[in-house]
Amino acid sequence: MQEAYVNINSIPTHIFTWGRWIEETITEKEIVICITGNPGLPGFYTEFAGTLQKELGDLPVWVIGHAGHDDPPEASIREVPQLSGNEELFNLDGQIRHKIAFIEKYVPSDVKIHLIGHSIGAWMILQLLENERIRSRIQKCYMLFPTVERMMESPNGWVFTKVAMPLYSVFGYIFFSFFNFLPVWLRLMLIQIYFLIFSIPRQFLGTALKYSKPSVAEKVVFLADDEMARVRGIQREIVEQNLDLLKFYYGTTDGWVPISYYDQLKKDYPKVDAQLDTKKIDHAFVLRHSQPMAVIVRDMIQQHRRV
């Protein structure tokens, strides 16, 4: 595994790679790129992506998070712009431009991309397919637990808009500022207690600590709020025009994407390649189900390799 912060659209962006670094010459004719969900900290995806690359063996796997969701170390000379006055860098449109810039800079035009999108990453993939320069490079898109429609109407969307956002608007900045005022050891201990309660592996402690920074949390919430406003009905024209490129994977216990969304997709597009999970994998699969999900995605990719 290799990792570094690289400037994409003038924003320091944390990139993780397995098999080949982004600045190395790519000799393979295919590559796997994973666009994260929200929060877009690629550190949550290390077990998933590492397992996937090991299972595939010969394909590089890269993970890119979202602009502003993972600040460089304090000693770094690179700084992420503040949210205020730079909203266009961190909303959905800004995140899409961010992904286009990354692909165009680091992926050679003759290399085909197996593009994984988790949660809102799947919605971003639909927007990327509108860009012919990107679309022409794609081998297949794997839409995992895809929040591509009616986010606000979902059970979790209702909780976010009716409960979480009002609370964050009043107490969010104060809470995160106070939390970050605490000594690091105490912050880690509190996060570890939370992890124990919800059975989250300790390996994500460092990533969760980054997530708790006020400058990161506000951008995560800002993007989520934009998702609620923008992700409404499914984008029928994009889906219809790209059915051959899309593979959907839906959960059965997903508060963001109820099974009814899967049923409606199958009804509206009888020929769509959509699969319903049988292993009770969570929406946030990277926290507890990285390895089984990596095996599932491996099988998907193997079916759609270039001949």
Swiss-Prot record:
It catalyses: a cholesterol ester + H2O = cholesterol + a fatty acid + H(+). GO terms for biological process: lipid droplet organization; lipid storage; negative regulation of juvenile hormone metabolic process; regulation of lipid storage; triglyceride storage. Keywords: Endoplasmic reticulum, Hydrolase, Lipid droplet, Membrane, Transmembrane, Transmembrane helix. The keyword Cytoplasm does not apply. Its EC number is 3.1.1.13. The chain crosses the membrane at residues 166-186, 188-208. PROSITE patterns: LIPASE_SER. GO terms for cellular component: endomembrane system; endoplasmic reticulum; endoplasmic reticulum membrane; lipid droplet. The active site is at S119, D254, H283. GO terms for molecular function: lipase activity; serine hydrolase activity. The keyword Hydrolase applies. It comes from the Eukaryota. Probable serine lipid hydrolase associated with lipid droplets. Appears to lack or have very low cholesterol esterase activity. Appears to lack triglyceride lipase activity. Involved in cholesterol and triglyceride homeostasis; stimulates cellular triglyceride accumulation and cellular cholesterol release. Involved in negatively regulating juvenile hormone (JH) and possibly, insulin signaling activities such as triacylglycerols (TAG) storage, and thereby plays a role in the endocrine regulation of organismal growth and survival. Belongs to the AB hydrolase superfamily. LDAH family. Interacts with the juvenile hormone hydrolase enzymes Jheh1 and Jheh2. Also interacts with Hmu, Cpr, Gp93 and Pvr. 'Sturkopf' means 'stubborn person' in German. The name originates from mutant larvae which do not adjust their developmental timing to their nutritional conditions. PANTHER family: LIPASE (PTHR13390), LIPID DROPLET-ASSOCIATED HYDROLASE (PTHR13390:SF0). This is Lipid droplet-associated hydrolase. It comes from Drosophila melanogaster (Fruit fly). The lineage of its organism: Eukaryota, Metazoa, Ecdysozoa, Arthropoda, Hexapoda.
